[in-house]
């Protein structure tokens, strides 16, 4: 049973999937940083220095805090600023994934469209060609 599992785990699809998950996690961290550290501050600068990650709507009168972390400690809040940031994050990841898949599909189509090389003539055909060429010379 262990041998069977090892064979299953070493199949190309399983290994490819594992590599894809690891690369996807790393890419997700990069996009999260891009959104949180680059895009959202730029949007905040354009909109007058707003920090969307701290935008929330209190769902309880007990919530009097002005930042999200303290507000969550005081009671229920609707953290729509965090949701907005994560939505932008998702859109960027989905768009980049679309571009990658589109590029892969374009490459596949080019490979399929490329004409196949003509098959090498058989030994008999090569021999007959040589005989013909010799007869032409004489």
From Swiss-Prot:
A single Gene Ontology CC annotation of this entry is: membrane
The UniProt transmembrane annotation reads 19-39, 81-101
What is the membrane topology here? Multi-pass membrane protein
Q: Which Pfam families match?
A: MscL
Which Gene3D superfamilies does its entry note? Large-conductance mechanosensitive channel, MscL, domain 1
Q: What are the subcellular locations of this protein?
A: Cell inner membrane
The record ties this protein, via InterPro entries, to: Mechanosensitive_channel_CS (IPR019823), MS_channel (IPR001185), MSC/AndL (IPR037673), MscL_channel (IPR036019)
Record GO terms (molecular function):
mechanosensitive monoatomic ion channel activity
BP terms from Gene Ontology: monoatomic ion transport
> Any idea which UniProt keywords this protein has?
Cell inner membrane, Cell membrane, Ion channel, Ion transport, Membrane, Transmembrane, Transmembrane helix, Transport
Which PROSITE patterns does the entry link to? Answer: MSCL
Q: Which HAMAP family match?
A: MscL
User: Hey, which family's this protein in?
Assistant: Belongs to the MscL family.
| Oligomer and partners | Homopentamer.
Q: According to its UniProt entry, what is the function of this protein?
A: Channel that opens in response to stretch forces in the membrane lipid bilayer. May participate in the regulation of osmotic pressure changes within the cell.
Q: What name appears for this protein in its UniProt entry?
A: Large-conductance mechanosensitive channel
Protein source organism: Bradyrhizobium diazoefficiens (strain JCM 10833 / BCRC 13528 / IAM 13628 / NBRC 14792 / USDA 110)
Q: Top-down, what is the taxonomic lineage of the species of origin?
A: Bacteria, Pseudomonadati, Pseudomonadota, Alphaproteobacteria, Hyphomicrobiales
